[in-house]
Amino acid sequence: LNGKISDIADPALLKDGQRLVDILAKKIADKAKIRIIGDYDIDGVMSTYILVKALKRAGACVDYMIPDRVKDGYGLNVHLIDKAYEDGIDTVVTCDNGIAAIEEIAHAKELGMTVLVTDHHAVPFEDIKGIKIYKESKADAVVNPHQIECSYPYKELCGAAAVSYTHLTLPTK
């Protein structure tokens, strides 16, 4: 309750944070269509709101989808990717989901799409004789403090905080 701004860790420590910003900056400059796919809980909605506002302020051609819990289920799925592709979307960015969407991201990549993941959930793994083998997607950038290679000190960020790096570092139009 009595924190200071200096108590916040440097968001540049988030693995792939700068890569994600660089990709988005290029997509904005190229006038590429970007779709944010959030989650239906409050963290997903706020994450989506933060990122849509940041991208619009930077001059992006951006829209968003919040999946229907009953119809679409949780997170990124093939139906949402196919819909984005049909709509001429170049880049899909997830908010508060995507870390476990290995096959779905592979599908988007096969369609030639750029995929950026912002998430805070645990990285999926396979346990082989007591050894955790972490699963990785073919996303172009993944911002998630739970990644093994991520040096961000606060692993329990919410999804909205995981998109904060983009919000803080994208240029404004």
Where are these regions (language model features)?
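A short, hydrophobic C-terminal helix/tail in secreted or cell-surface proteins
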Residues: 169-173
